[in-house]
């Protein structure tokens, strides 16, 4: 249990809080959303890949037709699945969808869909043939070869394009998995469907899943013998898949997210924008906020915090929780972050091959709030900035705007960081869309606009915001006011998993928080 200290001792009081009233519609929406954070295991978008795997390996008892029809509706005009604006994340989803439609060819007419998908795969350039970016889909080095083998087994003509770098990385990951012998709730379990063979009962975690992955859980169930001994395990896993199908907003049996539950991740990452916007002390929010802060404090252990209580602790959620709780006046120990520190980089989990610039920035930001500094990490962040002022190629998010926000939080107060963040500010101003928003896929999105607004707000607090930056801030807020009511199912997926996804409540918290910021 964490100990709370008085508000007069809260260490992060640089900005004056704005006296909103309960009549403020944005404040009222925050009051309504705060108690929902983490409930129901978290709210997250549906996954083409995981849905296809569930339909193939563990079809719902009510039938597969609604799920297959949903899969068909997700196909893009060019024949592939996933956003054409983010081609790196399409191949795995496309192959998985084709396998599912091919398997059920006698149930649903998908001939045209399959032909279009195969044609798409033949013409889509293999984007990780020679190099493997840090922004690779989660587990791709294992999942892609597995899907190709599945296609060959089912006699589906999936083209085998050059992927030397990816296959090499996959072999390294398999060696690592064999060495560590992963257990329930560990990161390798999240891709168990691609490397596992024996459905060990001990692999089932406290959520009733294999690695919080519907795909892995479905394949594990398909390989689990049916007998009296395994029936209780089967019931737990089937109940998990049923619950997972109810959190995407579609409510179609078998249509599932790519990762779930995410209750601790949703809570930590949803409260983080309140920290950025200096709203943790907002008097009107306290009745709704304090129980959630207590929940986060109870969940943070000496080992950190994970995306749920049944998954390994990770550096990203831990850094966010430490920053939030310390700022809110809780007694927490920043040394918890030490176990996630590498040589100038911070990791989510041990054994990771790709690095995360946003996670490292969040850790540096958290340490700064404690009055601490990791100068090696600061130097890495500074050296990682591109000539255009951006930080690209992150492990967990495809938008450079997400990176820019976290890097500005980490570097704006650093003596060596002024030049870098001013360069980033110039790029933010120049890249703002004509409607006042921001977006990296060719369209403006509310969440990315919130990152831009909060970046400029942070620069304002450090007396680094230019007049052009002030104008960009006001234009960004004006756009957000018109876009904040965007329906969840219409959101652009920008967060990286086995495919791109949307954590609905987290994005909404960023947007509402950005609307409540103010510059003089």
Per-region residue spans from a language model:
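Buried hydrophobic core positions in alpha-solenoid tandem helical repeats
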Residues: 71, 121, 241, 292-296, ...
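Alpha-helical repeat scaffolds
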Residues: 110-120, 285-290, 337-339
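Nucleic acid-processing catalytic cores of prokaryotic defense/repair systems
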Residues: 77-81
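Repeat-mediated protein-protein interaction surfaces in helical alpha-solenoids
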Residues: 29-38, 191-204
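An alpha-helical repeat/solenoid feature that recognizes helix-turn-helix modules
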Residues: 2-5, 9-22, 40-66, 83-112, ...
């Amino acid at each position: 249990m964490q100990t709370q200290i008085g508000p007069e001792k809260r260490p992060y009081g640089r900005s004056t809080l704005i006296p909103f009233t309960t009549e403020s519609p944005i404040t009222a929406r925050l009051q309504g959303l705060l108690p929902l954070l983490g409930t129901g295991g978290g709210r997250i978008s549906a996954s083409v890949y995981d849905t296809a795997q569930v339909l193939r390996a563990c079809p719902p008892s009510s039938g597969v037709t609604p799920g297959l029809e949903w899969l068909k509706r997700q196909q893009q005009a060019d024949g592939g699945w996933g956003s054409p604006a983010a081609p790196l994340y399409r191949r795995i989803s496309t192959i998985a969808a084709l396998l599912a439609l091919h398997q059920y060819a006698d149930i649903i007419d998908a001939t045209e869909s399959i032909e279009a998908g195969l044609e798409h795969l033949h013409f889509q350039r293999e984007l990780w043939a020679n190099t493997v970016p840090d922004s690779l889909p989660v587990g791709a080095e294992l999942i892609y070869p597995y899907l190709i083998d599945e296609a060959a087994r089912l006699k589906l003509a999936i083209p085998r394009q050059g992927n030397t770098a990816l296959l090499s990385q996959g072999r390294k990951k398999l060696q690592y998995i064999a060495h560590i012998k992963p257990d329930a709730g560990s990161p390798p379990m999240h891709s168990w469907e691609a490397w596992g063979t024996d459905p060990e009962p001990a692999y089932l975690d406290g959520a009733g899943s294999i690695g919080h992955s519907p795909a892995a859980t479905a394949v594990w169930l398909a390989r689990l013998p049916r007998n009296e001994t395994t029936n209780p395990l089967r019931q737990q896993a089937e109940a998990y898949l049923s619950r997972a199908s109810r959190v995407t907003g579609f409510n179609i049996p078998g249509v599932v997210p790519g990762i779930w539950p995410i209750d601790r991740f949703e809570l930590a990452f949803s409260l983080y924008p309140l920290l950025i916007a200096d709203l943790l002390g907002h008097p009107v929010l306290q009745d709704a906020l304090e129980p959630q802060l207590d929940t986060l404090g109870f969940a943070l252990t000496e080992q950190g915090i994970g995306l749920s209580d049944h998954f390994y602790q990770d550096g990203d959620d831990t850094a966010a929780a430490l920053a939030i709780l310390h700022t809110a006046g809780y007694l927490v120990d920043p040394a918890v972050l030490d176990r996630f520190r590498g040589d100038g980089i911070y990791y989510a989990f041990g054994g990771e091959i790709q690095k995360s610039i946003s996670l490292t920035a969040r850790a540096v930001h958290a340490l700064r709030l404690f009055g601490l500094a990791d100068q090696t990490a600061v130097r890495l962040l500074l050296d990682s900035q591109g000539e255009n002022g951006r930080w690209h190629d992150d492990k967990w998010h495809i938008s450079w705007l997400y990176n820019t926000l976290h890097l500005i939080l980490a570097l704006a107060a650093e003596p060596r960081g002024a030049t870098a963040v001013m360069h980033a500010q110039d790029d933010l101003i120049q890249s703002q869309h004509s409607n006042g928003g921001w977006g990296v896929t060719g369209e403006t999105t509310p969440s990315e606009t919130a990152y831009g607004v909060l970046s400029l707000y942070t620069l304002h607090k450090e007396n680094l915001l230019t007049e052009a930056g002030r104008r960009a801030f006001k234009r960004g807020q004006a756009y957000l006011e018109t876009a904040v009511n965007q329906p969840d199912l219409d959101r652009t997926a920008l967060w990286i998993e086995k495919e791109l996804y949307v954590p609905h409540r987290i994005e909404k918290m960023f947007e509402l928080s950005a609307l409540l910021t103010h510059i003089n």
